[in-house]
């Protein structure tokens, strides 16, 4: 394997953090909807 490009690495990191952020928002939305509709 060649050494990873730092730019590529930062883009990958941003994509991963964006994915986790969206996942966290989705989970919070589900929890809040369950809380409000009960």
UniProtKB/Swiss-Prot annotation:
Pfam families: PsbL (PF02419)
SUPFAM superfamilies in UniProt: Photosystem II reaction center protein L, PsbL (SSF161017)
Alphabetical list of InterPro entries matching this protein: PSII_PsbL, PSII_PsbL_sf
Localization per Swiss-Prot or TrEMBL: Plastid, Chloroplast thylakoid membrane
Keyword annotations of the record: Chloroplast, Membrane, Photosynthesis, Photosystem II, Plastid, Reaction center, Thylakoid, Transmembrane, Transmembrane helix
Membrane topology, record value: Single-pass membrane protein
Record-level GO cellular component terms: chloroplast thylakoid membrane; photosystem II reaction center
Membrane-traversing stretches: 17-37
Coarse class of the protein's main subcellular location: plastid
GO biological process: photosynthesis
Family: Belongs to the PsbL family.
Subunit structure: PSII is composed of 1 copy each of membrane proteins PsbA, PsbB, PsbC, PsbD, PsbE, PsbF, PsbH, PsbI, PsbJ, PsbK, PsbL, PsbM, PsbT, PsbX, PsbY, PsbZ, Psb30/Ycf12, at least 3 peripheral proteins of the oxygen-evolving complex and a large number of cofactors. It forms dimeric complexes.
Primary role: One of the components of the core complex of photosystem II (PSII). PSII is a light-driven water:plastoquinone oxidoreductase that uses light energy to abstract electrons from H(2)O, generating O(2) and a proton gradient subsequently used for ATP formation. It consists of a core antenna complex that captures photons, and an electron transfer chain that converts photonic excitation into a charge separation. This subunit is found at the monomer-monomer interface and is required for correct PSII assembly and/or dimerization.
Protein name per its UniProtKB record: Photosystem II reaction center protein L
Naturally occurring in which organism (per UniProt): Chaetosphaeridium globosum
């Amino acid at each position: 394997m060649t050494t990873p490009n730092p730019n590529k690495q930062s883009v990958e990191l941003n994509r991963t953090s964006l994915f986790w952020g969206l996942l966290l928002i989705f989970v919070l939305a589900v929890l809040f909807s369950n809380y409000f509709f009960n």
